C-alpha cells in the first residue's frame, strides 16, 4: 500500500490568526498564555486538516521561523542575548526582532542593547529565515522542549506524527561564522546533540523522523559532501527511522551520495526532478522508502492527476509499500484553503489548488494507486476537464502580447548615453547635495489607510471619498518629508496594498485571491497575485498618484514601480510557458508606465527589483541563463527614458557579491540595497569590482522597531565610503517603511538626515 505524508503545513492560519496573535502579543495587548494557546489551537486544527495522511508533520509550526526554532533546540543562541534574563520565548523574539515583547526600552546594538538576527531568503523562495550565528568556540546543548510539547499534543489528538527537523549539515550551511571560522569544524560538536535529540524522540515512541537536507539539490564541494556522509554515518546507530528530505530541485551530481547515505527513506522533489525518479527507484537499497513529491508544494496550480498516475503506477508496482507520496516540499509556501475564495472567478478557481486541496489530490492519487483508477473515476474526470479548460482558454492566450514579445530586440534595452553623460545631465536637472537622502518608497500603512481601503472595497466609501482619503495621506507624507529635509521624496504608497498585488490588479492576465496569504517572515504575510495568462497594461497605473504628489513640492518626487523580475518572482506564476516569456511580457508593461511617468514630468523613477536574486537557480551552472533574461527584462522596462531622467532600483535581502557584474549590467543610475543587518558586509563586493554608478547602502534595519543613532549611521556610511567614492553615495533606509509606525519612522529619519549633514561637513572639511 502506498503511504501519504506531508513535509510541512502553513503555520499562519487560514485567516492569518498567527500574524494577528503575534502582533497583539508584541504590542502588549495579549499575554504569553494567550499566544501559546493560539499556537496550540492552530496546531490542533492543522493536524485535523491532515487527518487523512498516514503521517502528519510535527515541529513544522513556529512562532517566527523554523530555522530559529532549530537554533534554540540546539542551544545555539547568539552571545548578545545569552545574558538577558527571562525565558526562551523572550530571547527567541529578541533574536528575531531585536527586542522581546513588552520591552520598548530595549534597543539595537547600535543603541546599547541587542541587534536582531540577520535575515535572508530560504533557498530560492520568498520565505526568510533567521541566520544561525557561529563562532569557533560555539557549543551546542539540547533543548527538546518545543518538540516534546508538540509531540504530547499530537499524541493527545491521536495523530500519527512524524517530527520534522532541519538536518545538521544544512543547518551549518545556512548559518554564518561571525569570526570567519570554518562552520564544518563545528560538526563534531553538533552531531552528539542531534543524536541525543533522536534518542529523546525514540524514548517517546516516535517511529519516523523527517530530517531535511535541502542542500543536496545545490552544488556541493568535497568538504560538504564529506560532512553529509560523516553526519549520517554517525546518526545511523540510532534506533529511529530517518526520512531524509530534499526539495527545491534536482539531485544531479548528488544523487549517488543521497542514495548511499545510511537512512531509511529518501524524499525527492519529483516536480522538479521527475527525470531522476526512475534512477532513484533502481538505485535505492531494497528496504529503503522512496518518497515522491508528486504535488507541487510551491505553486497553486492543480496537478494533472491522470498524467501523474501514468508514471506513478509503474513505480507503485515496482516499489509496493516502499513508495510514499507527498508534496514536493513543505506547503508553507502556498495558501491554506481555496474554499475560502468565493469571489475568485469560477473558471480560474477551477484551475487552482491550495494546501488543503493539494492534500486532497495526494489522497486521490494514493487511492487510485492502491485501489485502481476506477474507484476515483469521477474525480479524475473532473480534474481532466479543469486541466483542459486552462490549456485552451482564450483568457490565458493573447496573440497581441505574444507578437509584442516576439518583436523585442537588443536596442529596446539600451539608454541613449553612457552613465557619465547621464550623470551630468541628471546633476544639472536635479541639483542634489552630496550624500543625498531619500527613502525606499513606502511610509507607514496606518489604521486610517487600511480602514479607507477596506471601506472602499466593501462599497462603504465611494471612489471620490477614497481618492480624497489617499490624497490626504500622500500630502501628509510629503509634508513630513519636507519637514525632515529629505532631498528626494516619495509619495508614500498609501494607495497600495502590496508592491506586487497593486500592479497585478491593473494588468490583464492576473487574478487575485482574498485569503491567499503566505508567510514571508515572522508576522509578515504576503498575498501573491496569480499570473495566469499573457500580460498587458490597459492603462496607466501610478501616474495620477505620483503627479499629485509632485504637485505638492518643488523637490524631486520619485515615481515608484515594481520591476518585472520582482513581480514575476513574487507571484504565483503560470507553469505552461517559460518564466522568461512571462517576464518579458511584464517588462513591456512596466516600460509603458515608465514612459508615461516621464511624460508627466517625473524626474526620478525607481524600479524595485527586490527579488532579483531570489530567482537565481540553486545551481550556479544555471545562473547565466537566468541572469541574461532577468537583466534584459529590467533594461527593457527602464531604459527608454531621456538622459536627464534618473532611474533607481532597489534590492533587499540581496547578497549579491557573486552577481555584482550582472547588477552593473542593469545600468540603473542609482541602486539602493539592504546592508545594515550585515554591517555593510554586502559592500565587500566592491573591494574587487568598481561599481560604475551611484549606490545607496541601507543604513538602518526597517524590519526592527529599534531607532538607529546618528553616530551609528555616520559610522556605517564611513565604512561605505572606504569602497565607494563619496560623490556617488546616497543615504537611505534598508527598505520601505510600510510596516513601521510613524513614531518609529520620524526619529529614525531625523537621525538619518542629520548623519548626512555630518558627512557633508566632514567631506567639505577634508575629514
Swiss-Prot record:
Pathway(s) this gene product operates in, as recorded in its UniProt entry: Amino-acid biosynthesis; L-methionine biosynthesis via de novo pathway; L-methionine from L-homocysteine (MetE route): step 1/1
Name the needed cofactors. Answer: Zn(2+)
The name on file for this protein is: 5-methyltetrahydropteroyltriglutamate--homocysteine methyltransferase
Listed EC numbers: 2.1.1.14
Gene name, Swiss-Prot/TrEMBL: metE
- Residues reported to bind L-homocysteine: 440-442, 493, 608
Q: Does the keyword Metal-binding apply?
A: yes
UniProt-listed Gene3D superfamilies = 3.20.20.210
- The superkingdom of the source organism is Bacteria
Q: Which NCBIfam families match?
A: met_syn_B12ind (TIGR01371), PRK05222.1 (NF003556)
Q: Which GO terms describe its biological process?
A: methionine biosynthetic process; methylation
Q: Where does L-methionine bind?
A: 440-442, 493, 608
Instruction: Quote the catalytic residue positions.
Output: 703 (proton donor)
Catalytic activity annotated for this protein?
5-methyltetrahydropteroyltri-L-glutamate + L-homocysteine = tetrahydropteroyltri-L-glutamate + L-methionine
PANTHER family attached here?
5-METHYLTETRAHYDROPTEROYLTRIGLUTAMATE--HOMOCYSTEINE METHYLTRANSFERASE
Amino acid at each position: 500500500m502506498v503511504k501519504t505524508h506531508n513535509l510541512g503545513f502553513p503555520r499562519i492560519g487560514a485567516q492569518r490568526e498567527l500574524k494577528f496573535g503575534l502582533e497583539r502579543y508584541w504590542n502588549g495587548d495579549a499575554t504569553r498564555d494567550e499566544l501559546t494557546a493560539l499556537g496550540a489551537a492552530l496546531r490542533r486544527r492543522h493536524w485535523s486538516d491532515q487527518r487523512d495522511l498516514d503521517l502528519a508533520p510535527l515541529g513544522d509550526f513556529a512562532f517566527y521561523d523554523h530555522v530559529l526554532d532549530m537554533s534554540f533546540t540546539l542551544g545555539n543562541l547568539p552571545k548578545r542575548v545569552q545574558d538577558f534574563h527571562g525565558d526562551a520565548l523572550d530571547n527567541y523574539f529578541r533574536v528575531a526582532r531585536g527586542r522581546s515583547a513588552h520591552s520598548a526600552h530595549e534597543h539595537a546594538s547600535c543603541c546599547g542593547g541587542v541587534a536582531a538576527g540577520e535575515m535572508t531568503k530560504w533557498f530560492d523562495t520568498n520565505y526568510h529565515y533567521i541566520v544561525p550565528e557561529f563562532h569557533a568556540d560555539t557549543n551546542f546543548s539540547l533543548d527538546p522542549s518545543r518538540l516534546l510539547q508538540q509531540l504530547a499534543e499530537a499524541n493527545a489528538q491521536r495523530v500519527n506524527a512524524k517530527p520534522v527537523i532541519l538536518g545538521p549539515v544544512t543547518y551549518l550551511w545556512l548559518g554564518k561564522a561571525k569570526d570567519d571560522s570554518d562552520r564544518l569544524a563545528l560538526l563534531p560538536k553538533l552531531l552528539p546533540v542531534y543524536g541525543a535529540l533522536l534518542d529523546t524522540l525514540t524514548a517517546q515512541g516516535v517511529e519516523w523522523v523527517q530530517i531535511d537536507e535541502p542542500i543536496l539539490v545545490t552544488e556541493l564541494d568535497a568538504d560538504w559532501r564529506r560532512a553529509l556522509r560523516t553526519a549520517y554515518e554517525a546518526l545511523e546507530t540510532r534506533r529511529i527511522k530517518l526520512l531524509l528530505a530534499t526539495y527545491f530541485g534536482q539531485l544531479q551530481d548528488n544523487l549517488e551520495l543521497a542514495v548511499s547515505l545510511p537512512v531509511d527513506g529518501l524524499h525527492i522533489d519529483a516536480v522538479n526532478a521527475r527525470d531522476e525518479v526512475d534512477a532513484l527507484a533502481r538505485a535505492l537499497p531494497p528496504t529503503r522508502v522512496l518518497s515522491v513529491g508528486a504535488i507541487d508544494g510551491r505553486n497553486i496550480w492543480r496537478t494533472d492527476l491522470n498524467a501523474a498516475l501514468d508514471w506513478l503506477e509503474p513505480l507503485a508496482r515496482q516499489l509496493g509499500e516502499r513508495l510514499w507520496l507527498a508534496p514536493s516540499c513543505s506547503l508553507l509556501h502556498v495558501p491554506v484553503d481555496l474554499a475560502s475564495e468565493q469571489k475568485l472567478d469560477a473558471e480560474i478557481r477551477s484551475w487552482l489548488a491550495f494546501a488543503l486541496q493539494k492534500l486532497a489530490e495526494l489522497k486521490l492519487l494514493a487511492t487510485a494507486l492502491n485501489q485502481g483508477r476506477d474507484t476515483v473515476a469521477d474525480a479524475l474526470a473532473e480534474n481532466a476537464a479543469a486541466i483542459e479548460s486552462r490549456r485552451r482558454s482564450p483568457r490565458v492566450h493573447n496573440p497581441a502580447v505574444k507578437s509584442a514579445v516576439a518583436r523585442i530586440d537588443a536596442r529596446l534595452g539600451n539608454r541613449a548615453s553612457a552613465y557619465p553623460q547621464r550623470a551630468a545631465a541628471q546633476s544639472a536637472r536635479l541639483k542634489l547635495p552630496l550624500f543625498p537622502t531619500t527613502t525606499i518608497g513606502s511610509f507607514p500603512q496606518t489604521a486610517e489607510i487600511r480602514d479607507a481601503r477596506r471601506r472602499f472595497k466593501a462599497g462603504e466609501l465611494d471612489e471620490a471619498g477614497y481618492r480624497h482619503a489617499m490624497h490626504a495621506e500622500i500630502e501628509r507624507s510629503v509634508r513630513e518629508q519636507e519637514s525632515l529635509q529629505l532631498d528626494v521624496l516619495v509619495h508614500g504608497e498609501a494607495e497600495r496594498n502590496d508592491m506586487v498585488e497593486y500592479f497585478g490588479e491593473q494588468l490583464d492576465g492576473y487574478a487575485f485571491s482574498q485569503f491567499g496569504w503566505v508567510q514571508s517572515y515572522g508576522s509578515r504575510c504576503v498575498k501573491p497575485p496569480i499570473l495566469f495568462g499573457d500580460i498587458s497594461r490597459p492603462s496607466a497605473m501610478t501616474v495620477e498618484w505620483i503627479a499629485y504628489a509632485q504637485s505638492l513640492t518643488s523637490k524631486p518626487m520619485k515615481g515608484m514601480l515594481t520591476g518585472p523580475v520582482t513581480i514575476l518572482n513574487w507571484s504565483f506564476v503560470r507553469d505552461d510557458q517559460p518564466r522568461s516569456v512571462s517576464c518579458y511580457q511584464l517588462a513591456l508593461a512596466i516600460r509603458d508606465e515608465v514612459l508615461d511617468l516621464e511624460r508627466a514630468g517625473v524626474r526620478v523613477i525607481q524600479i524595485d527589483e527586490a527579488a532579483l536574486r531570489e530567482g537565481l537557480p540553486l545551481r550556479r551552472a544555471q545562473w547565466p541563463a537566468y541572469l541574461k533574461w532577468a537583466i534584459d527584462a529590467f533594461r527593457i522596462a527602464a531604459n527608454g527614458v531621456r538622459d536627464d531622467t534618473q532611474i533607481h532600483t532597489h534590492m533587499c535581502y540581496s547578497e549579491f557579491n557573486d552577481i555584482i557584474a550582472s547588477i552593473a549590467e542593469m545600468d540603473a543610475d542609482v541602486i539602493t540595497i539592504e546592508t545594515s543587518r550585515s554591517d555593510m558586509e554586502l559592500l565587500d563586493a566592491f573591494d574587487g569590482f568598481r561599481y560604475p554608478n551611484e549606490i545607496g547602502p541601507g543604513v538602518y534595519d526597517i524590519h526592527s522597531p529599534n531607532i538607529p543613532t546618528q553616530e551609528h549611521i555616520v559610522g556605517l556610511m564611513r565604512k561605505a565610503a572606504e569602497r565607494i567614492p563619496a560623490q556617488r553615495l546616497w543615504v537611505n533606509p534598508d527598505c520601505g517603511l510600510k510596516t513601521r509606525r510613524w513614531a518609529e519612522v520620524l526619529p529614525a529619519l531625523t537621525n538619518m538626515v542629520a548623519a548626512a549633514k555630518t558627512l557633508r561637513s566632514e567631506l567639505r572639511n577634508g575629514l
